[in-house]
A protein has these predicted regions:
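Amphipathic alpha-helical surface "interface" segments used
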Residues: 75-82, 124-128
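Conserved short "hinge" loops at termini or chain/domain junctions
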Residues: 1-80, 143, 149-156
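Short loop/turn elements at secondary-structure junctions
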Residues: 90-156
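A general marker of short, structured functional hotspots
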Residues: 19-20, 28, 87, 91, ...
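Short, glycine/alanine-rich amphipathic alpha-helical segment
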Residues: 78-94
Length: 156
C-alpha cells in the first residue's frame, strides 16, 4: 500500500500582523513563515497562537531590560543606541530570533499530535532535539540583548 501526502505551499488565509506592546515591533506571521521556511501545512491559527505565546514569554523575560531602557528615555527598541561594535538593528534582530525560535520550538513539539501511530511517537522523539536547539537559540538571543553570557557556571 502506498500513500501520497501533499505538502502545502500556499497560505490557508490571510494572516494579520500580531500587535506587540509598543516597545517591541508588531510581528507579521509571514516573516516567521519565511525565515523559518514554514509552509501552509501549519495553519495560520497555529502560527499565530505560537507567535503570540512566544511574544508573551520573551516580553516577560525582557521586561526589566525594557523598563530600564524606557526609563532612560528610549520609548522603542529602534531608539536605543547600538554599541559601536554591533551591527545596526542588532536588538531588533535578536528579539525576532528569540520570538521566532520560541514559537518554532513550540510548533515542533506539536507535530507528533497529527498521528497516533508508532511512527509519530518516534518522530516526536527525533524532533525533541531541534526543539531544544530552538529554545537554546532563544535563550542566547535574550542573553545577548541583556548583555549577559550564554551560560552560568557555579562551583559546587
Amino acid at each position: 500500500m502506498s500513500s501520497f501526502i501533499s505538502a502545502g505551499t500556499t497560505r490557508d488565509t490571510a494572516e494579520s500582523t500580531i500587535e506587540n506592546n509598543g516597545f517591541w515591533p508588531d510581528i507579521p506571521p509571514s516573516d516567521f513563515r519565511e525565515r523559518h521556511r514554514l509552509d501552509s501545512t501549519i495553519t495560520s491559527a497555529r502560527i499565530e497562537g505560537a507567535l503570540l505565546a512566544a511574544m508573551a514569554t520573551v516580553n516577560r523575560m525582557l521586561r526589566h531590560w525594557q523598563a530600564e531602557k524606557v526609563d532612560a528615555g528610549y520609548p522603542t527598541v529602534d531608539d536605543i543606541p547600538v554599541p559601536v561594535w554591533q551591527a545596526p538593528g542588532v536588538f531588533l534582530g535578536l528579539y525576532l530570533r528569540a520570538v521566532f525560535s520560541t514559537a518554532h520550538a513550540s510548533l515542533i513539539e506539536r507535530y507528533a499530535d497529527y498521528d497516533a501511530t508508532n511512527s509519530a511517537r518516534e518522530r516526536g522523539e527525533q524532533l525533541a532535539d531541534p526543539a531544544d536547539s530552538y529554545r537554546r537559540d532563544a535563550a542566547w538571543a535574550i542573553s545577548e540583548i541583556e548583555g549577559r553570557p550564554h551560560s552560568t557556571v557555579e562551583l559546587i
